[in-house]
């Protein structure tokens, strides 16, 4: 939110704010079911704050809720049946902004793209686009790994790569690019890039560091059931898993 405050998304408790100096936690955005224009859900999968200080919330399972801090008002974005100019699915798991200021949403039925300049929507990898050949349409994480190159991961063994210019889709499964007998992941829960340009991918069986240019893949043994990846500094990464939190040097 700023240098002193962080927003924390919860599953059932809405959004809380923590002061990084005092560690004081206070409710920030909580459902108000008695108001027609209040917050409408407490299960928040992801948070994004834009340049206008609007808070975009992946409000599971009812779409996107946008809170405007300047006017304390809310706006709702939902899927409209048969309308291609809408969010592809209301069950949103992740939100990112790319280098050009446009937004991408990972959902339980494909990926939605929102052009912030024109207000136009596009979607890929959903059940409505059978020509793209993917059998799984649930995506849990999304990341811009290079300018205009988007990776999306979910309930599949690898990542789908989307070229923003052409909206063409390709598939990348790391074990195929190594000479090891590492088994493919059951799912990809988080994809991140670090300061050096490496791509980090965390799944059910392993943590991987990928060089996009050379397609070299390094596996980190002993780390599995990955849920979150955050870069601490140039030499270390925080790795969250189903069993705890690790600091990787």
Residue ranges and their predicted role:
Residues 1-249:
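Carboxylate-rich, polar loop motifs that coordinate divalent cations or form catalytic acidic clusters
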